[in-house]
Amino acid sequence: MMKYRFSSNSVSVWLTACREGYFLSEIAVLEEADELPENEKTMFHSFHAQLRNVICGTMAYPYTLINEKDDTEKPEHLLEIQLQKYKKYKREEMIYSLALMKAACKVYMRIRQVPVLHHQCINLETFIVSLFEEGKRVFNALCSVEDAAVYVGIGSINQRVTRLAKETIAVFKSRVYKKALGRQLNMDNEFMLPFNISTVVKANDSRFLLGGIHSQTDGCMDDSETAANSASARIIYKEQTIIEDSDYRRSAGGVVGCSNGSAITVLDRESKKGLIQDIYAFYNPVTNGLGHIKIKLKTEPPQIISIYLPTSRAVHLANTTKWNFPVSLTKRGIDETDDYYEQVPIKRIKTAYSKPDPPCNNEKHSVGHAVTATNTTTNVVSALPASEEQTQTFQHFEGCSLHYNVLRDNTTTYHHHTCPKNKDNMALPQIDQMVHPDMCTAGYGPMMDQATALLPPILQPHQTKVATVRPHIHHDVETETVNNNTESFTQTTNTQTETNIEQTQAEHESHHVESGLPQTNTDYEVSAVLESDDLQACLDELINATSPAELFQMGNGCSFDWLLNELDLELDSENVFEPISLDDCNLGLSESNDYIGLT
């Protein structure tokens, strides 16, 4: 079972900010604090006092791990270990400790003039609270206005910015999430922010982000001037602008403007221009829904407010505190609207096949991969000389080794787009089996040296391996998958290999075609490089023809490293993929809240 953990990059950022912020404030900046304005001086000393408590407490001394094998001691980064201990903390201790870490980062950001990435602040806060067994109740308590006093130095909540954020989320609920995805969802259950919207303001410090907007804008602003000098926010989903409207009106306070619920902007008091540049919505392929939202502001340097959503909850589990992955995702087909965000290129797929039936023969080709639509097993003698027949077979394509079968009942065979059989055999009748004794590659003829014929062709430069599926392989047979543009072939013992070569030579001398595979107890691993046109049809056929249980079993062997990389998550290396029970709706997440539903 996959276990997500907080990004190590973000952990390093926070750890560096806490430690360097402390030493900078302790050694180099105390004297300079006297030159600050009175309010800044008070804020700085507040930061420094909290930071001293953090560094002089658990943050200063990392845990030491003793390796029993070589009797060595290794210092361990303490932040992740400390976060795990939060599960045992009381509510007040957790809130105060979190405030201390935030204050440490504020010192680092203010003194060094290097802003800590704000989406990492949101990430860390969400990660910490997700470790609690109390779940949502602690989250709401942490984010409530009554607890805002513990955020010393972060400042009071900007109500106008809070209102802006709430209206922004309302637009996403009504337009982007419901219309763009077109799903029949219970909005209260499926679209749940993991925190109160005021957390966004507190975690990012509205004064720092919004360039000093604290007071009401004068009510004498002209509507035409506002419309001319301001640009409304665009809501962008999957590289397409969903909402863009420059016609908006001034609200009662003159700060937040909306025309018909589709345009949202925040006006700078001095420049009278909109501060929000873009609002991006990102698709999450794991949950098949909205992943996170990024609000880009027109500040110098540009700042981004990120709102990360948890995974979707099942309707009947809406009132629980457990994170849940939707069980029904693997039963869905692929449709055109479900593009992986960031255009993840899937160009290679491997799948496993069961033990083949007795070999059958090809009625059309004398070289290559033979498939037949009948149950007969007769030797077919070619009517043409071997050289002429080989020329006709390979004259239209080069390097085609992509005769593969994707359905469990072997009813459909797909070919490379340059293969002459590409269109003819897209929908064959029932096929007893798929056999591929030889390489279907140009130049692999009877006159070639047999040792050379067993080598794979040159890898095409435009074909890359991105995502793979690793099927189960029996231990008694070693299966080797040849790189991209080749079929995988099975290496058994040396005796079997020599026997196969002798049989191949005898077949070429007699100009008979006898296709077959050795009867071995193995699941054949077939590798194929898929073009973009073939991928859609391949996955559609595979999903529609496979039962949910088989899909779950197939998914247990998948490597989602590329997906985790796109989602800025890391896979716990100590955990391996384990079988998933279909009866367990929360996929093994009921025992602990360490599994985070973040994207």
From Swiss-Prot:
UniProt protein name: Protein ORF A
Source organism superkingdom: Viruses
